[in-house]
Amino acid sequence: MLVYQDLLTGDELLSDSYPYKEIENGMLWEVEGKWVTKGVVEVDIGANASAEGGEDEGVDDTAVKVVDIVDVFRLQEQPAFDKKQFLGFVKRYIKLLTPKLDAEKQELFKKHIEGATKYLLCKLKDLQFFVGESMHDDGSLVFAYYKDGAADPTFLYFAYALKEIKC
C-alpha cells in the first residue's frame, strides 16, 4: 500500500486506495470522495421482530455520515479563504515547497503553479479547505468541492507536495 504524506509536515493526506486523476499539467490531483455512514452496527439474529411484536428496544444508533477521505486521514476543515488570503497562502507555499523539490521538479513547479492557482481561484467560492491532522500552518491545503449535480465531494491535492511512502 502507498501512502502520500505532506512533504512539508509529514501528515498522511491520501493513499493509493483512492485513485486520482492528474489535472492542470500534473500540478493537481483530483480524487473522488464518498459520504459513508460510520458507527452503524447491524445485527441479524434471525428473528422476525414484527412477528414477535418487538420494536427497536431503545438501541442508541450513533451512526454519523462522514466523508471517507476526511475521516480516514483525519483532515481538519479550515475557514474559507478570500482571494487575498488565498494568494497570500500560495506565495508563502511556493517559498516553502520549492526548496524541498529536486531541480527538475522545481522547474516544472514554477512553470505550472500559476495555471493551477488560476484553476483554484475560479473555484474559490465553492471550495472547502482542509489541512492534515497536525493542523500545521505551513502545511499543504487539501481542497474539496462538489461537481455539478454530484452528491459526493471531489478533492484537489497539490501533487508536488505529496511524498510517496510504502507501507
Swiss-Prot record:
GO molecular function term, any single one = calcium ion binding
Q: Where is the TCTP domain?
A: 1-167
The superkingdom of the source organism is Eukaryota
Q: Which UniProt keywords apply?
A: Calcium, Cytoplasm
Determine if Cell membrane is one of this entry's keywords. no
Which Gene3D superfamilies is this protein grouped with? Metal Binding Protein, Guanine Nucleotide Exchange Factor, Chain A (2.170.150.10)
Q: Which InterPro entries match?
A: Mss4-like_sf, Mss4/transl-control_tumour, TCTP, Translation_control_tumour_CS, Translational_control_tumour_p
Function recorded in the entry = Involved in calcium binding and microtubule stabilization.
Protein name per Swiss-Prot or TrEMBL: Translationally-controlled tumor protein homolog
Q: Which gene encodes it?
A: TCTP
